[in-house]
Amino acid sequence: MSTTLLKKETLERKWYVIDAAGKPLGRTAVIAANILRGKHKVDFTPNVDCGDFVIIINTDKAILTGKKAEQKVYYRVSGWIGGLKETKARIMMEKRSDYAVELAVKGMLPKNSIGRNAMTRLHLYKGAEHPHAAQKPEAWTL
């Protein structure tokens, strides 16, 4: 009996909606990363990009547990000498919550072409509305 491997041509991609309101940021990111990777499928193949599309709504209502709001720091570099900028997680969640969720999911994906392709299937929205109703996404409960 031989193992059947998943091929790109026979792949079906579904759409899922995750509501991040009142949910911890990390747990939401773990679920999204697993769906983007395709680990929830029975025929998951590690070397094939077999993940589904993920829509995360209400990113502005995601929560940070513990002291992470004040202690976690996001860094970026302007490119100039001494141009290291830092932003606390509380400020990041107030101003750019979708980017904070994007960084969390990106850190949980593989650092290769499969991870980069998976990030193109992630859609983030601050409010409860999204323009992907035509794809008929299924709700994923945490």
Report residues per predicted region.
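Ribosome large-subunit tunnel/peptidyl-transferase-proximal elements
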Residues: M1-L103, S113, P131-L142
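C-terminal structural segments of small proteins and small subunits
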Residues: E102, L109-P131
